[in-house]
A protein has these predicted regions:
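An exposed acidic His-Trp-rich patch
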Residues: 89-185
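Extracytoplasmic c-type cytochrome modules immediately beyond a signal peptide or single-pass transmembrane anchor
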Residues: 43-103, 107-108, 116-123, 127-128
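N-terminal domain-onset segments
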Residues: 1-80, 143-245
Length: 245
């Protein structure tokens, strides 16, 4: 199996221009089951997703690979968020990964080798890249101020940017955009998002609204580890499984 920094072997589900996954149209019987289950099942974890945030993410081993990402956010408590990450907010959106977000206090309690898998959010927030879609800035300002002092760990399980129609190969670690190259997000990518959602993340828009926002006293140097000149890729290797009790 290839690592996350390699393309998978050619399959009918890799490297295509067609975004839809392979498969037959949903059968009527399956649709009926879905409708019936919706009436009787609580789906409690799903109903805890209260926010839709849009931002951007970069591949930790190749910062040229950049994605617009859509987080459906649920709050475990004030210091821990968990996010299902999609490639759009359309009904046909693909679940491409998961991000966990923790406060700076929790992050500082992690061992150094674990910290290296996490990224800071200060620049992403203050630059207006992250926004709660459709929510007025005045309403989301307290939340964005808190988020600027958080750290995230984002695993991408479906690398749609290379044309994969299914989740192939190992998951990829993702990082947040930063102010310095090569970690700056593509301006065209941001412009497309802004136009679609009528967001102004320019110097006269969200950036100006957030310029007075308190910044973290410091950003732990073990986060955003690519700034040290090192990325991370995931290898899947065979091993003997444990048969003990």
């Amino acid at each position: 199996m290839p690592s996350s920094d390699q393309n998978p072997a050619a399959t009918p589900a890799s490297g295509t221009a067609e975004p839809a996954p392979p498969g037959r149209p949903t059968a009527v019987s399956s649709q009926v089951l879905d409708m019936g289950a919706q009436l009787v099942q609580a789906l409690k974890p799903v109903r805890q997703m209260k926010q839709h945030a849009c931002s951007f993410a970069l591949d930790a081993h190749d910062l040229r690979r950049q994605l617009e990402v859509h987080h459906l956010v649920s709050r475990l408590n004030q210091d821990v968020l968990q996010c299902a990450v999609y490639d759009s907010d359309e009904p046909s959106a693909r679940l491409i990964g998961v991000e966990y977000i923790v406060s700076d206090t929790i992050f500082e309690s992690l061992p150094p080798e674990e910290k290296r898998l996490w990224h800071s959010h200060a620049y992403e927030v203050k630059a207006g890249l992250r926004t709660d879609v459709g929510v007025r800035e005045a309403l989301q300002s307290s939340e964005t101020a808190r988020l600027s002092k958080t750290y995230g760990k984002f695993w991408c399980t479906w690398q749609v940017d290379r044309g994969d129609q299914l989740p192939l190969s190992a998951p990829a670690l993702m990082v947040s955009p930063q102010a310095t190259e090569p970690g700056r997000v593509c301006a065209e990518l941001v412009r497309g998002r802004d136009e679609r959602y009528r967001v102004d993340s320019s110097a006269g828009g969200l950036k100006a609204d957030r310029v007075e926002m308190d910044e973290p006293e410091w950003i732990n140097p073990n986060a955003d580890y690519w700034l040290h000149g090192m990325g991370f890729a995931v290898d899947v290797v065979p091993c003997f499984f444990f048969l003990g009790r």
